[in-house]
Amino acid sequence: MEAAQSPCLRVSVSPRPHSPNYNSLCMSWSTVRVPASSANLGPGFDALGMALGVYLDCRFRPSRRLSIAATGRDRAAISTAADNLIWQTALSVAADVRMKLPPIDLVIDNQIPIGKGLGSSAAALTAGVVIADRLLGLGWRPPRILDEAARLEGHPDNVAACVLGSIVASAIDSGGVVRAVRLELPARFGIALVVPDFELPTVEARAVLPSCYSREDAVFNVQRAALLIAALAAGSTTAFPAALEDRFHQPYRIPLVPGLADILLLRAPGLLGCALSGAGPSILVFYESGYEAVCDLVRQIFQLHGHSAEVLLTHIAERGFEVGQVPGPPAGAAFPEGIDA
């Protein structure tokens, strides 16, 4: 879903007697790569998430002082101070398990557009949980990492895609445990993103939604969500135009995204359908062929409403987060002198 652009978590960490001996840790750089994600996919409000082949890459290692460097897309929007979301997430995990986290050197190479409905904060939260898991030696498996990331995010749809990859249907059961099922997809359609030149804060996008829905609208969305999951699993593209219809969130967000009404009604050769990505304003485009022409139509609609837009050709990321190691520091990383954490 819509990844909340909330302030970074702020916690204090009390060490416990059996924290790891960080002097014995290997000082080579560890890595974590997390995919972007698109939530909702039309009718699957707060339930469906898709991992995308656009990534947040982090390198990290224990250090004497906290140092954070940011490169890549929207780097000016990424804090390199102690309130960095990735670092604060790692601290929150450490506090939760009552262990002490060492300061780290952290290099963030981001390619995910920030504030555009593409799961940038979910990727950061997932990276923070993974970093804490590695540094503290917790040995968490993906389901535990997903539970922790969903607890911090407040909903599981984006982080489920970040952790598991592909397209994921998820829910939180009555005991607070995330239940998620990953779909294995036949590759019979393409994915592209049209990213306009403005941001849409999640809190604003959620504020326009009603507090309750009619039975008619609820049945409408349940039918479409079921149809979409079946179409995705079977590789049946003929159902896409109907399966992407929605009455839960997109109609209410039309005033916030200039051109959205026309984009959702767009029909063209090779186009399977469009959906608002998460809370928006980016548009997720499903196509069979001719993505350039299809995406150009979406871009032209934004232009008619006074906004430029960028087309990103991408794909469904089959893998969720991945971890590894590299022998030396990343080239060209410029660190501040140190941060008082």
Which residue stretches match the model-derived regions?
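Glycine-rich, charge-dense phosphate/pyrophosphate-binding loop(s)
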Residues: 232-341
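Intrinsically disordered, low-complexity proline-rich regions
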Residues: 7-11, 15-19
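Short beta-strand-to-loop capping motifs
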Residues: 62, 172, 196, 285-289
